[in-house]
Amino acid sequence: MNLEDIRDNPGARKKRMRVGRGIGSGKGKTAGRGVKGQKARTGVAIKGFEGGQMPLHRRLPKRGFHNIFRLDYNEVSLGKIQAAVEAGKLDAGQPVTEAALVAAGVLRRAKDGVRVLGTGELSAKVTLEVAYATKSAVAAVEKAGGSVTVLAAPAVAEAE
């Protein structure tokens, strides 16, 4: 057997049908699109349209809602605070607030407050002024000789 003897299996490579090239081709005139109607026209069909059948997005029930008063908190671990203190980005003598964490590069941007999580080790004596702290975080800060002040949540304006 030589290289020139190798052939594709019969029907393995089928030529593509060129549509709309005259009635003699077998796919001329309407080019396999049938006659008139929306599907015969150019352009994309309506997304989600299922030919008059109730579309999937309307068959499924509505669920949930979007709470416009939901607060978005930054979460920071004690390990990250300790790393920032060790790197000299945070001053352990000053209160650790959201603004201080943003300035130190621990957080990207200020949101509705900071939630301190108890993961990681903390040995620095720090004073935290945050919106929320877990029980384990408060215990770890107080064990290191620091303190935690939980700030009041921002007031939500009453709808009139």
Curated annotation (Swiss-Prot):
InterPro entries from the UniProt entry: Ribosomal_uL15, Ribosomal_uL15/eL18, Ribosomal_uL15/eL18_sf, Ribosomal_uL15_bac-type, Ribosomal_uL15_CS
One MF term in the entry's GO annotations: structural constituent of ribosome
A Pfam family this chain is assigned to: Ribosomal_L27A
Keywords: Ribonucleoprotein, Ribosomal protein, RNA-binding, rRNA-binding
Composition bias type Basic and acidic residues, residue spans: 1-11
Keyword RNA-binding belongs to the record: yes
BP terms from Gene Ontology: translation
Region (Disordered): 1-37
SUPFAM superfamilies in UniProt: Ribosomal proteins L15p and L18e
Biased composition (Gly residues): 21-35
A GO term from the CC aspect: cytosolic large ribosomal subunit
Regions annotated as coiled coil: none
Similarity comment: family membership: Belongs to the universal ribosomal protein uL15 family.
Subunit-level organization: Part of the 50S ribosomal subunit.
Function: Binds to the 23S rRNA.
Protein name: Large ribosomal subunit protein uL15
UniProt source species: Xanthobacter autotrophicus (strain ATCC BAA-1158 / Py2)
